Protein backbone atom coordinates (compact mmCIF):
# COMPACT_ATOMS: atom_id res chain seq x y z
CA UNK A 1 0.00 0.00 0.00
CA UNK A 2 2.76 2.45 0.92
CA UNK A 3 4.63 1.67 -2.29
CA UNK A 4 1.56 2.34 -4.44
CA UNK A 5 0.91 5.61 -2.66
CA UNK A 6 4.52 6.68 -3.16
CA UNK A 7 4.24 5.83 -6.86
CA UNK A 8 0.98 7.80 -7.16
CA UNK A 9 2.71 10.78 -5.60
CA UNK A 10 5.24 10.89 -8.45
CA UNK A 11 3.30 9.40 -11.38
CA UNK A 12 0.09 11.09 -12.46
CA UNK A 13 -1.29 8.02 -14.24
CA UNK A 14 -0.91 5.97 -11.06
CA UNK A 15 -2.55 8.75 -9.07
CA UNK A 16 -5.54 8.58 -11.43
CA UNK A 17 -5.75 4.82 -10.97
CA UNK A 18 -5.56 5.23 -7.21
CA UNK A 19 -8.41 7.76 -7.15
CA UNK A 20 -10.48 6.12 -9.90
CA UNK A 21 -9.70 2.39 -10.25
CA UNK A 22 -12.29 1.99 -13.03
CA UNK A 23 -10.69 4.63 -15.24
CA UNK A 24 -10.62 3.63 -18.92
CA UNK A 25 -7.29 3.62 -20.77
CA UNK A 26 -6.67 5.80 -23.81
CA UNK A 27 -3.73 6.93 -25.91
CA UNK A 28 -4.75 10.56 -25.51
CA UNK A 29 -4.49 10.17 -21.74
CA UNK A 30 -0.84 9.19 -22.18
CA UNK A 31 -0.29 12.44 -24.09
CA UNK A 32 -1.92 14.46 -21.31
CA UNK A 33 0.09 12.64 -18.64
CA UNK A 34 3.35 13.40 -20.44
CA UNK A 35 2.45 17.10 -20.55
CA UNK A 36 1.50 17.12 -16.87
CA UNK A 37 4.80 15.52 -15.90
CA UNK A 38 6.73 18.20 -17.80
CA UNK A 39 4.92 20.90 -15.87
CA UNK A 40 5.57 19.09 -12.59
CA UNK A 41 9.26 18.88 -13.50
CA UNK A 42 9.40 22.67 -13.51
CA UNK A 43 9.47 23.22 -17.26
CA UNK A 44 7.82 26.56 -18.17
CA UNK A 45 5.36 25.04 -20.60
CA UNK A 46 3.19 26.85 -23.14
CA UNK A 47 1.04 24.02 -24.38
CA UNK A 48 -2.14 23.82 -26.44
CA UNK A 49 -3.97 20.51 -26.53
CA UNK A 50 -6.82 20.41 -29.04
CA UNK A 51 -9.03 17.41 -28.42
CA UNK A 52 -12.47 16.24 -29.53
CA UNK A 53 -15.38 16.53 -27.05
CA UNK A 54 -16.36 13.81 -24.58
CA UNK A 55 -12.83 12.47 -24.24
CA UNK A 56 -12.42 12.91 -20.49
CA UNK A 57 -10.16 15.93 -20.92
CA UNK A 58 -11.81 18.13 -18.29
CA UNK A 59 -11.85 15.33 -15.73
CA UNK A 60 -8.09 15.15 -16.05
CA UNK A 61 -7.16 18.74 -16.88
CA UNK A 62 -9.42 20.63 -14.49
CA UNK A 63 -9.91 18.08 -11.70
CA UNK A 64 -7.36 15.31 -11.30
CA UNK A 65 -4.28 17.18 -12.52
CA UNK A 66 -4.75 20.25 -10.27
CA UNK A 67 -5.42 17.92 -7.33
CA UNK A 68 -2.18 16.04 -8.01
CA UNK A 69 -0.22 19.24 -8.69
CA UNK A 70 -1.36 20.86 -5.44
CA UNK A 71 -0.41 17.70 -3.56
CA UNK A 72 3.04 17.74 -5.12
CA UNK A 73 3.54 21.48 -4.70
CA UNK A 74 1.29 22.74 -1.89
CA UNK A 75 2.99 26.16 -1.83
CA UNK A 76 2.18 26.96 -5.46
CA UNK A 77 -0.79 28.81 -6.89
CA UNK A 78 -3.19 27.41 -9.49
CA UNK A 79 -5.62 29.48 -11.54
CA UNK A 80 -8.29 27.53 -13.45
CA UNK A 81 -10.46 29.23 -16.05
CA UNK A 82 -13.49 27.91 -17.96
CA UNK A 83 -15.92 29.75 -20.24
CA UNK A 84 -18.14 30.47 -17.22
CA UNK A 85 -17.08 30.68 -13.59
CA UNK A 86 -19.60 28.11 -12.35
CA UNK A 87 -17.86 25.33 -14.29
CA UNK A 88 -14.45 26.18 -12.88
CA UNK A 89 -15.96 26.53 -9.40
CA UNK A 90 -17.52 23.08 -9.67
CA UNK A 91 -14.10 21.63 -10.42
CA UNK A 92 -12.69 23.59 -7.49
CA UNK A 93 -15.30 21.99 -5.24
CA UNK A 94 -14.44 18.52 -6.54
CA UNK A 95 -10.74 19.05 -5.87
CA UNK A 96 -11.46 20.45 -2.42
CA UNK A 97 -13.66 17.48 -1.56
CA UNK A 98 -11.13 15.01 -2.96
CA UNK A 99 -8.38 16.47 -0.81
CA UNK A 100 -10.36 15.59 2.30
CA UNK A 101 -10.74 11.91 1.37
CA UNK A 102 -8.65 9.13 2.84
CA UNK A 103 -7.49 8.07 -0.64
CA UNK A 104 -5.97 11.47 -1.29
CA UNK A 105 -4.45 11.79 2.17
CA UNK A 106 -2.84 8.37 1.77
CA UNK A 107 -0.94 9.79 -1.22
CA UNK A 108 -0.28 13.28 0.19
CA UNK A 109 -0.41 12.83 3.98
CA UNK A 110 0.98 16.27 4.82
CA UNK A 111 -1.28 18.37 2.60
CA UNK A 112 -4.52 19.77 3.98
CA UNK A 113 -6.95 22.56 3.26
CA UNK A 114 -6.48 25.69 5.34
CA UNK A 115 -9.27 25.98 7.89
CA UNK A 116 -10.02 29.61 7.03
CA UNK A 117 -10.23 29.29 3.22
CA UNK A 118 -12.37 26.45 1.89
CA UNK A 119 -14.84 28.00 -0.57
CA UNK A 120 -15.17 26.08 -3.81
CA UNK A 121 -13.77 28.81 -6.05
CA UNK A 122 -11.04 30.10 -3.69
CA UNK A 123 -9.22 27.90 -1.24
CA UNK A 124 -5.77 27.55 0.28
CA UNK A 125 -3.58 24.72 1.49
CA UNK A 126 -1.93 24.53 4.88
CA UNK A 127 1.28 25.55 3.05
CA UNK A 128 -0.37 28.76 1.74
CA UNK A 129 -0.71 27.49 -1.79
CA UNK A 130 -3.88 28.67 -3.54
CA UNK A 131 -6.53 27.58 -6.01
CA UNK A 132 -8.63 30.17 -7.80
CA UNK A 133 -11.49 29.37 -10.19
CA UNK A 134 -12.82 31.89 -12.69
CA UNK A 135 -14.62 32.38 -15.96
CA UNK A 136 -13.84 34.49 -18.99
CA UNK A 137 -14.20 38.07 -17.79
CA UNK A 138 -13.57 37.28 -14.12
CA UNK A 139 -11.59 39.79 -12.10
CA UNK A 140 -8.16 38.35 -11.29
CA UNK A 141 -6.36 41.44 -10.01
CA UNK A 142 -4.13 40.77 -7.04
CA UNK A 143 -3.87 37.06 -7.83
CA UNK A 144 -0.93 35.16 -9.24
CA UNK A 145 -0.45 31.76 -10.81
CA UNK A 146 2.33 29.22 -11.13
CA UNK A 147 -0.05 27.16 -13.24
CA UNK A 148 -2.74 28.68 -15.45
CA UNK A 149 -5.26 26.20 -16.86
CA UNK A 150 -7.67 27.31 -19.59
CA UNK A 151 -10.25 24.60 -20.20
CA UNK A 152 -12.77 25.16 -23.02
CA UNK A 153 -12.91 28.90 -22.55
CA UNK A 154 -15.24 29.31 -25.53
CA UNK A 155 -18.83 28.28 -24.92
CA UNK A 156 -20.68 26.10 -27.40
CA UNK A 157 -23.49 28.64 -27.57
CA UNK A 158 -21.28 31.56 -28.61
CA UNK A 159 -19.61 29.37 -31.23
CA UNK A 160 -22.48 27.43 -32.78
CA UNK A 161 -25.84 28.88 -31.74
CA UNK A 162 -27.80 29.43 -34.93
CA UNK A 163 -24.66 29.62 -37.08
CA UNK A 164 -24.55 27.97 -40.50
CA UNK A 165 -21.06 29.30 -41.17
CA UNK A 166 -17.89 29.34 -39.03
CA UNK A 167 -17.88 32.00 -36.29
CA UNK A 168 -16.22 35.31 -37.11
CA UNK A 169 -13.21 36.91 -35.47
CA UNK A 170 -15.52 39.26 -33.57
CA UNK A 171 -17.21 36.30 -31.86
CA UNK A 172 -13.96 35.64 -30.00
CA UNK A 173 -12.66 39.16 -29.37
CA UNK A 174 -13.89 39.24 -25.76
CA UNK A 175 -12.06 36.03 -24.81
CA UNK A 176 -8.89 37.15 -26.60
CA UNK A 177 -8.85 40.57 -24.96
CA UNK A 178 -9.48 39.04 -21.55
CA UNK A 179 -6.67 36.52 -22.09
CA UNK A 180 -4.25 39.40 -22.69
CA UNK A 181 -5.22 40.85 -19.32
CA UNK A 182 -4.45 37.71 -17.31
CA UNK A 183 -0.95 37.15 -18.70
CA UNK A 184 0.43 39.51 -16.08
CA UNK A 185 -0.83 37.11 -13.39
CA UNK A 186 1.67 34.38 -14.33
CA UNK A 187 4.67 33.92 -12.05
CA UNK A 188 8.22 33.53 -13.42
CA UNK A 189 8.70 30.02 -14.86
CA UNK A 190 4.94 29.47 -14.67
CA UNK A 191 3.11 27.27 -17.15
CA UNK A 192 0.02 27.83 -19.28
CA UNK A 193 -2.05 24.86 -20.36
CA UNK A 194 -4.82 25.46 -22.92
CA UNK A 195 -7.09 22.47 -23.47
CA UNK A 196 -10.09 22.87 -25.75
CA UNK A 197 -11.87 21.70 -28.84
CA UNK A 198 -11.40 23.97 -31.83
CA UNK A 199 -14.21 26.16 -33.11
CA UNK A 200 -12.68 28.48 -35.67
CA UNK A 201 -9.36 29.71 -36.98
CA UNK A 202 -10.18 32.88 -35.00
CA UNK A 203 -10.63 31.18 -31.62
CA UNK A 204 -8.09 31.57 -28.80
CA UNK A 205 -5.89 28.71 -30.01
CA UNK A 206 -5.91 30.03 -33.56
CA UNK A 207 -4.81 33.47 -32.41
CA UNK A 208 -2.12 32.13 -30.09
CA UNK A 209 -0.68 29.98 -32.88
CA UNK A 210 -0.85 32.86 -35.36
CA UNK A 211 0.85 35.24 -32.92
CA UNK A 212 3.68 32.74 -32.37
CA UNK A 213 4.26 32.43 -36.10
CA UNK A 214 4.28 36.19 -36.67
CA UNK A 215 6.56 36.98 -33.72
CA UNK A 216 9.33 34.35 -33.46
CA UNK A 217 10.81 36.08 -30.41
CA UNK A 218 7.64 35.59 -28.36
CA UNK A 219 6.63 32.51 -26.39
CA UNK A 220 6.28 29.67 -28.85
CA UNK A 221 3.30 27.42 -28.31
CA UNK A 222 3.56 23.68 -28.59
CA UNK A 223 0.40 22.24 -30.14
CA UNK A 224 -0.87 18.69 -29.71
CA UNK A 225 -3.86 17.72 -31.86
CA UNK A 226 -6.07 14.77 -30.92
CA UNK A 227 -8.92 14.33 -33.44
CA UNK A 228 -11.91 12.01 -33.06
CA UNK A 229 -11.04 9.99 -36.15
CA UNK A 230 -7.53 9.28 -37.36
CA UNK A 231 -6.87 8.78 -41.04
CA UNK A 232 -5.06 5.55 -41.89
CA UNK A 233 -3.68 4.25 -45.18
CA UNK A 234 -3.12 0.57 -45.94
CA UNK A 235 -0.34 -0.83 -48.11
CA UNK A 236 -2.55 -0.51 -51.21
CA UNK A 237 -3.10 3.19 -50.60
CA UNK A 238 -6.69 2.81 -49.47
CA UNK A 239 -7.86 5.31 -46.86
CA UNK A 240 -9.85 4.32 -43.80
CA UNK A 241 -10.56 5.90 -40.43
CA UNK A 242 -10.08 4.69 -36.87
CA UNK A 243 -11.39 6.07 -33.60
CA UNK A 244 -8.65 7.57 -31.46
CA UNK A 245 -10.39 6.30 -28.32
CA UNK A 246 -11.81 2.90 -29.28
CA UNK A 247 -12.08 1.90 -25.62
CA UNK A 248 -15.03 4.31 -25.35
CA UNK A 249 -16.03 5.52 -28.83
CA UNK A 250 -16.09 2.84 -31.53
CA UNK A 251 -15.02 3.75 -35.05
CA UNK A 252 -18.50 2.88 -36.29
CA UNK A 253 -20.12 5.28 -33.81
CA UNK A 254 -17.79 8.13 -34.77
CA UNK A 255 -18.27 7.58 -38.50
CA UNK A 256 -22.04 7.57 -38.00
CA UNK A 257 -21.80 10.82 -36.05
CA UNK A 258 -19.68 12.37 -38.79
CA UNK A 259 -22.17 11.43 -41.50
CA UNK A 260 -25.09 12.70 -39.42
CA UNK A 261 -23.39 16.04 -38.79
CA UNK A 262 -22.26 16.43 -42.39
CA UNK A 263 -25.84 16.04 -43.60
CA UNK A 264 -26.98 19.11 -41.65
CA UNK A 265 -26.50 22.78 -42.65
CA UNK A 266 -23.27 23.98 -41.10
CA UNK A 267 -22.36 20.43 -40.16
CA UNK A 268 -19.12 20.34 -42.15
CA UNK A 269 -17.37 23.10 -40.24
CA UNK A 270 -18.74 21.83 -36.94
CA UNK A 271 -17.37 18.33 -37.52
CA UNK A 272 -14.02 19.49 -38.90
CA UNK A 273 -13.50 22.02 -36.12
CA UNK A 274 -15.01 20.41 -33.03
CA UNK A 275 -14.16 16.78 -33.71
CA UNK A 276 -11.21 16.81 -36.10
CA UNK A 277 -9.58 19.96 -34.65
CA UNK A 278 -9.17 21.30 -38.18
CA UNK A 279 -10.96 24.64 -38.45
CA UNK A 280 -9.08 25.32 -41.66
CA UNK A 281 -11.52 22.86 -43.25
CA UNK A 282 -14.54 24.63 -41.86
CA UNK A 283 -16.11 25.56 -45.18
CA UNK A 284 -18.39 23.16 -46.99
CA UNK A 285 -16.99 24.46 -50.28
CA UNK A 286 -13.51 23.09 -49.63
CA UNK A 287 -12.31 20.11 -51.64
CA UNK A 288 -12.80 16.77 -49.98
CA UNK A 289 -10.88 13.57 -50.54
CA UNK A 290 -14.01 12.02 -52.03
CA UNK A 291 -13.80 14.53 -54.89
CA UNK A 292 -10.56 13.04 -56.21
CA UNK A 293 -10.63 10.41 -58.96
CA UNK A 294 -7.91 8.16 -60.34
CA UNK A 295 -7.28 7.33 -63.99
CA UNK A 296 -5.43 4.18 -64.93
CA UNK A 297 -4.39 5.60 -68.31
CA UNK A 298 -1.14 7.54 -68.68
CA UNK A 299 -2.95 10.70 -69.76
CA UNK A 300 -6.11 12.03 -68.05
CA UNK A 301 -9.22 13.19 -69.91
CA UNK A 302 -9.64 16.84 -70.86
CA UNK A 303 -9.63 18.98 -67.71
CA UNK A 304 -10.88 22.50 -67.03
CA UNK A 305 -8.05 23.08 -64.55
CA UNK A 306 -4.72 21.37 -63.86
CA UNK A 307 -3.16 21.76 -60.41
What is each stretch, according to the model?
Residues 77, 81-140:
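Conserved nucleotide-state-sensing and coupling region of NTP-binding domains
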Residues 160-234:
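ASCE P-loop NTPase helicase motor core
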Residues 233-307:
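ATPase catalytic-site recognition across NTP-hydrolyzing enzymes
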Residues 61-73:
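Walker A/P-loop NTP-binding motif
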Residues 1-45, 302:
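N-terminal accessory segments
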Amino acid sequence: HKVKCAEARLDFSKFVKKINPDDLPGRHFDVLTSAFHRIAAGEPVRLIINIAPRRGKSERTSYLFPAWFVGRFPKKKVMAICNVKTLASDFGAKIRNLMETQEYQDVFPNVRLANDAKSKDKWRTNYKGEYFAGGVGSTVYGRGADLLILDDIHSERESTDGKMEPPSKEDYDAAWNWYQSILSRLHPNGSILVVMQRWSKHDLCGRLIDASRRTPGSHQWEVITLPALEEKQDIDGNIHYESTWPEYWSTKAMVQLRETMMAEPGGAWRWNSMYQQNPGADSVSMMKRDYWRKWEKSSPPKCEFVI
